[in-house]
Amino acid sequence: MKRIGILTSGGDAPGMNAAIRAVTKTAIHHGLEVFGIRYGFAGLVAGDFIPLTTENVDHKISEGGTFLYSARFPEFAQEEVQQKGVEQLKKHGIDAVIVIGGDGSYHGALALTRHGVNSVGLPGTIDNDIPYTDYTIGFDSACRTAMDAIDKIRDTASSHHRVFVVNVMGRECGDIAMRVGVASGADAIVIPERPYDVKEIAETIKRGFADGKDHGIIVLAEGVMDAEEFKDELLKYGDFDARANVLAHMQRGGSPTVEDRVNATKMGNYAVNLLLDGKGGLAVGMENGKLNTHDILDLFDSKHQGDFSLLDVNEEMTKD
């Protein structure tokens, strides 16, 4: 193996640049050439490759987003499109590829491996919804951004004795909502994985006001329902002022946290060493603080298990 490629695919996440940097510097240390593939699998098929050096990745560690850019490219599920991508890799002399992204990106990495190009997947998504890993690159930064926003929302909520339903990202995974909800002292956390009772949540809010509290915060995972709809349901059971706030894509931006920089660096370094050992079709993860690998194929038949103890802790402190 003399030359490897790296791409980012799907939604961007803080820490992706740190992973690209780690891959590049580790590979160069081992005498390999590194090419960045811009715009994900779309760029792979188009042959949009750029050489990466220590000099052009070193200052990227503190930057959010991905300087290789990203794009969703569902066409890569087609066999003939995959073959075009493989032909581009052969044309550029690239022997293996590291893919950073979510579950859709892993399908692409597996396809490349099946076509004879060893590929390793790194979990890059703020949603933290990848099986067999406790952590995905960007999750901690997204939580910090959401928590900072909710801290500011609380200021205005308190000024007006108002309730805010704050919608956070995560798709069908409630990990951001649970972590941010606990960190921001939410009165209720609502996630797709657990049943909820809007009337009971309204009673919790009313009880808080009766006890002298001057605001209410409900953290709502996006996979549950629209924030405005939830607010309207809530107001059926309570005579209080309420607003809905959707944090949306701001959670993907910003400089990555220490945790995201360190873990992305460890994962990028590990991925290169896997390729040097001739391994492919693997997904890198982290469980109990330690790096692991699983066959990518296993991920498609599994579901991420969140830390629901956070929800239990919050409910014990807020319910009667």
UniProtKB/Swiss-Prot annotation:
Enzyme kind, highest EC tier: transferase
Give the keywords, sorted. Answer: Allosteric enzyme, ATP-binding, Cytoplasm, Glycolysis, Kinase, Magnesium, Metal-binding, Nucleotide-binding, Transferase
Part of which pathway?
Carbohydrate degradation; glycolysis; D-glyceraldehyde 3-phosphate and glycerone phosphate from D-glucose: step 3/4
- Give the matching SUPFAM superfamilies: Phosphofructokinase
- GO MF terms on file? 6-phosphofructokinase activity; AMP binding; ATP binding; fructose-6-phosphate binding; identical protein binding; metal ion binding; monosaccharide binding
| Catalytic reactions of this protein | beta-D-fructose 6-phosphate + ATP = beta-D-fructose 1,6-bisphosphate + ADP + H(+)
Q: Where does ADP bind?
A: R21, A22, V23, T24, K25, R154, G185, A186, D187, K213, D214, H215
Notes on how activity is controlled: Allosterically activated by ADP and other diphosphonucleosides, and allosterically inhibited by phosphoenolpyruvate.
Entry cofactors: Mg(2+)
- What superkingdom heads the lineage? Bacteria
- Where in the cell does this protein reside? Cytoplasm
GO cellular component annotations of the record: 6-phosphofructokinase complex
Q: Which Pfam families does its entry note?
A: PFK
InterPro entries per UniProt? ATP_PFK (IPR022953), ATP_PFK_prok-type (IPR012003), PFKA_ATP_prok (IPR012828), Phosphofructokinase_CS (IPR015912), Phosphofructokinase_dom (IPR000023), PKF_sf (IPR035966)
Q: What is its main location?
A: cytoplasm
Give me the segments passing through the membrane: none
List ligand-binding residues for ATP: G11, R72, F73, G102, D103, G104, S105
Q: Which residues form the active site?
A: D127
Q: Which GO terms describe its biological process?
A: canonical glycolysis; fructose 1,6-bisphosphate metabolic process; fructose 6-phosphate metabolic process
HAMAP family in the record: Phosphofructokinase_I_B1
What biological function has been recorded for the protein in this entry?
Catalyzes the phosphorylation of D-fructose 6-phosphate to fructose 1,6-bisphosphate by ATP, the first committing step of glycolysis.
Task: Please describe the quaternary structure of this protein.
Answer: Homotetramer.
UniProt-recorded name of the protein: ATP-dependent 6-phosphofructokinase
Please tell me the species this chain comes from.
Answer: Lactobacillus acidophilus (strain ATCC 700396 / NCK56 / N2 / NCFM)
